[in-house]
Amino acid sequence: MRGAAAVQLHFVPGRSRPWLRRAALGAAALAVAGLAALPLCAQGPPSPAQPAYAPAPAASVYQPPASSAQFNGGVARGRVQPGVMALSLNAAIRMGLRNNLAVLLSSTASEQARAQRWRALSGLLPKVQASVGDEETKENLAAFGFSFPGFPQIIGPFRVFDARGYLDVPVLNISGIQDLRSSDASQAAAMHTYQQMRNLVVMAVADQYLLASADGSRVTAAQAQLRTAVQSLAQAEDMYHAGTVSALDVVRAKVQRDRERQNLIVRRDDWAKQKLALARAIGLPSGQAYRLAQPIPYTPAPSMTVNHALAEALRMRPDYMAARESVRAAQLAVAAARDQRLPSVDFSGNWGTIGNRINSNHPTFTLAGQINLPIFSGGAIHAAEIAAHARLRQAQDQASDLRAAIGQQVRSALLDVHAARQQVGVATQARRLARQELTLARDRFRAGVGDNLEEVEAEQEVAVAEENYIGSLYSFNAAKIELAQALGVAQASYRSFLEGAK
């Protein structure tokens, strides 16, 4: 296989996997090129070399399974450490690049492409083999139809000792050379695909970390809202005992307190489960306690124009590089199929000693040259050419589609960053106003102007405003890391996108 596919995935946005909205998964371009090893001859003249018209393996397109479970899974390494481990975003990404299942599977595919390249190379390299044999024989000539008057029917036993080395050298094989070049391009495509997978893992781990950080902020906000509800209940009870409010105000405050208690329980559960998901994605040992040690504050996104972003993406995206290498591999596969019509030249020989026993051996050798000229292959070469041309068109179409998809992804990511930045501004203003509303409602209730219904409603508005702010901040940071992925620089530049220029 010497082709590669760029599989475009689309997922419905959701809390669990929002980073997969427009992730372009570059498929591994695995080469399965190579010539069969020439058979090694026994004593005597070498066996004929493989015919030149033997069809080379056709290039094909390999599409690995694009499962989000690969990014959510990881291979746990090490042992559980005592105490609570402090986990920063940088440490989480380093662990993810080392332990995440998607990276490990892509690395294996890259090694397979490397093995296929060696297989193609082996068809062009000399083959050397040695053998030592000692044989004792007794034959019945009559069994083979030989009968001579005065000549014994039974001959032997006689002994033959032979020690010999064999050499097979493919002198000229144009199709095999093109096959090797195609495998080189496929190996390069596989390496680019591996780098693309690392970028996707950086985005996946960063998103899991951002989700865990957002859930932690939700727990903190829920705790603050519970404290506010408890204080409001205490104030309502004091005023009830003083005879300034009715029992309804006390009951309403208790309902609000219990609502905040329930909300805190749910938030803590979500946070704990999200931390488990992050731990699994980066390969933390099961049961390892940790805390998030790196808050992700609001920092402006890098400023760039659409044209600059598109040019950067086409220059840096590993999956686009893999697609171009796949086209090149397919072009060379077409040449390899066509060049099977050309003659090939092989040289073979052996040298050794042979005799009745070791001390009576005499050296012998055989040298042979062979030109293989395909005259009629039964349509095998024509079939290989048709298949190679079809896969070339497929690789070209996939590369063109990926180029268009990159343009869409970059534009969409820039739109998301712009919209999320505006959402953060609106959410910040709304949170400030909600807190101001709560202060005014509390003062009115304390002054006896009205009941605590306004205060309870204001507390709910504060909760909504806090949730909107946390969600908008997460969306903004997720949009920035998505932009880094769309540009092809997620692994190299995620810190500058999330933490700002330093």
Language-model segments: what does each one mean?
Residues 76-83:
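A detector for short, charged/polar N-terminal pre-domain segments
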Residues 44-69, 74, 94-172, 193, ...:
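A small-residue-enriched
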Residues 104-105, 121-122, 157-160, 171-198, ...:
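Sec/SRP-type N-terminal targeting helices
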Residues 23-39:
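Bacterial N-terminal signal peptides
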Residues 192, 198-312, 416, 420, ...:
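Periplasmic alpha-helical coiled-coil/stalk elements that build and connect Gram-negative outer-membrane
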Residues 9, 13-22, 41-58, 138, ...:
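Acidic, low-complexity, intrinsically disordered peripheral segments
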Residues 122, 259-284, 420, 431-489:
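Short segments within alpha-helical structural elements
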